[in-house]
């Protein structure tokens, strides 16, 4: 059974409903993080040094998408990112993965057209400029920053089907 590492958004958490959706696809590991603590990102990064990541995937929403993307870049693992805060990568955040890595694993982005916090167009430009591996970009026209369970379920299902085909 594959491990699914889920990273929530800033001041967020994985809801019970979304956890149940992900449990259909594997073993869900989703601690709650305090991203306000400057050491949190370093602790997350260091916690993966010794892990066996065979068959693992990274999933994140908003700021958790930034973290999940960082880890998937370092370890070349598939990632599913909902409204990821990718533009934070341009700030000094303690995560120094190269932006232009050529990955073999899929990066699957779900962006809300109605997101008022993270502009989907900025994310699309960033993704097309910097991501060199296989990417899939989905624009959900009715989605804002928060991801409704039905969209989360549909896109998780699509993502896991795509990585199963590889």
Question: Predicted regions span which residues?
Answer:
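Short alpha-helix in the alpha/beta-hydrolase fold that links the catalytic acid
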Residues: 18-19, 94, 119-129, 152
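Short glycine-rich catalytic loops that host catalytic nucleophiles or stabilize transition states
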Residues: 31-33, 136-144
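Active-site catalytic motif of lipid deacylating hydrolases and related acyltransferases
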Residues: 1-53
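Gly/Ala-rich beta-loop-alpha elbow adjacent to hydrolase catalytic centers
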Residues: 59-68
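Catalytic histidine-centered segment of alpha/beta-hydrolase-like enzymes
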Residues: 142-153
């Amino acid at each position: 059974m594959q491990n699914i590492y889920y990273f929530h958004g800033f001041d967020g958490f994985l809801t019970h409903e979304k956890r149940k959706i992900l449990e259909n696809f594997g073993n869900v590991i989703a601690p709650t993080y305090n991203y306000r603590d400057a050491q949190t990102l370093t602790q997350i990064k260091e916690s993966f040094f010794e892990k066996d990541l065979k068959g693992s995937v990274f999933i994140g929403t908003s700021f958790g998408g930034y973290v999940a993307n960082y880890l998937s870049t370092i370890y070349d693992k598939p990632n599913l990112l909902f409204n990821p805060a990718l533009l934070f990568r341009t700030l000094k955040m303690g995560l120094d993965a190269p932006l232009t890595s050529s990955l073999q694993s899929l990066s699957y982005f779900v962006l809300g057209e109605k997101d008022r916090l993270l502009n989907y167009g900025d994310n699309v430009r960033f993704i097309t400029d910097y991501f060199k591996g296989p990417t899939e970009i989905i624009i959900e026209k009715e989605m804002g920053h928060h991801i409704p369970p039905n969209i989360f379920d549909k896109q998780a299902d699509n993502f896991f089907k795509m990585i199963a085909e590889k």
